[in-house]
Design a protein with these regions (language model features):
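Broad gene-expression machinery/nucleic-acid interaction feature
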Residues: 26, 78-82, 137-139
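Active-site nucleotide/adenylate-binding loops and adjacent lid/helix of ATP-dependent enzymes
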Residues: 1-68, 75, 87-90, 119
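Peripheral (often C-terminal) accessory segments that flank ATP-dependent C-N-forming ligase machineries
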Residues: 170, 174-250
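Active-site "cap" helix and flanking loop/linker of ATP-utilizing ligase/carboxylase catalytic domains
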Residues: 116-142, 152-206
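A short beta-strand motif that forms the metal-chelation/ATP-contact edge
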Residues: 28-30, 83, 144-154
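Glycine-rich phosphate/pyrophosphate-binding beta-alpha loops
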Residues: 36, 101-105, 109-112, 151-164
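Phosphate-binding site of ATP-dependent enzymes
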Residues: 49-108, 113-132, 143-147
Length: 250
């Protein structure tokens, strides 16, 4: 059973999905797992505004996934709810972040995000994962009040757990060793901004180039205030790997 169908059964808002040609546009077309196919971020997501664009996008996407996901495009703010569930699917940790910028700016991975707290989002994300008897780490992606997808793995914005001083990683280690872990709501700092500086700089410049000056200038301002996602005191290996991959392998 699909995540989309289960969310509908639980009364959780989700975008409309289409099995064939959409009845209305715009729609988002994406493979079920773009990373599995080795796709770059810009190639994991496409928006069709009419039938001609849809046909062209489907022809391209079906090279990787014979039945890509076709969803109604939801506009508005994007957010993620990161959860840790124990062996009995009990809630052991939760952390919310909102997207501040992304790249490509038309729709792509987050380059800057900010921690916040939303009890309703956490409840809905947990209800969905618990219904599948899920255990472990996952990030549930929202757009406005709709759940878009579930990433049942360590996700790109995972460093926010450290930036916002969330105990999720510690709880994971304790639970894995059979220790007793108790969930406490809002057990992390809110209002913490975190960025991937190279990707975020490119995003800020792209906003400026697109005429979205306010967003672009805010991005340049965050260069001095937001926490760097991959900076670790005394260990530069992660940052060097990130720079190498960003500069030479994309």
């Amino acid at each position: 059973e699909s995540v989309h169908q289960r969310a509908l059964e639980l009364g959780i808002p989700v975008p409309r999905e289409y099995d064939g040609t959409p009845e209305s546009y715009p729609v988002v077309v994406k493979p079920h797992c773009g990373e599995k196919f080795g796709l770059k971020a810009a190639d994991r997501y496409a928006v069709a505004n009419n039938e001609a664009e849809f046909d062209a996008i489907m022809e391209k996407m079906q090279r990787y996934d014979p039945s890509p996901i076709v969803q109604q495009k939801i506009t508005g703010a994007g957010a993620g709810v990161s959860l840790l569930l124990g062996r009995e699917s009990e809630l052991l940790g939760a952390l919310c972040h909102r997207r501040v910028r992304e790249y490509p700016i038309t729709g792509g991975p987050s380059t800057c995000c900010e921690s916040f707290y939303d009890e309703k989002m956490i409840d809905e994300a947990y209800e969905l994962l618990k219904s599948f008897h899920f255990t472990g780490l996952a990030m549930v992606e929202f757009k406005e009040d709709c759940i878009l997808e579930v990433n049942p793995r360590v996700w790109g914005s995972f460093p926010m757990t450290e930036a916002a001083q969330s105990p999720i990683v510690a709880h994971y280690a304790q639970a894995a060793q059979g220790g007793q872990v108790t969930y406490t709501a809002k057990d992390y700092r809110t209002g913490v901004k975190m960025r991937f500086f190279l990707n975020d700089t490119v995003a800020a410049l792209s906003y400026l180039k697109a005429g979205r000056v306010k967003e672009g200038l805010r991005g340049l301002g965050d260069f001095f205030t937001a926490k760097e996602a991959l900076s670790a005191k005394g260990d530069g290996k992660v940052m060097r790997a990130y720079l190498k991959k960003s500069l030479f392998e994309r």
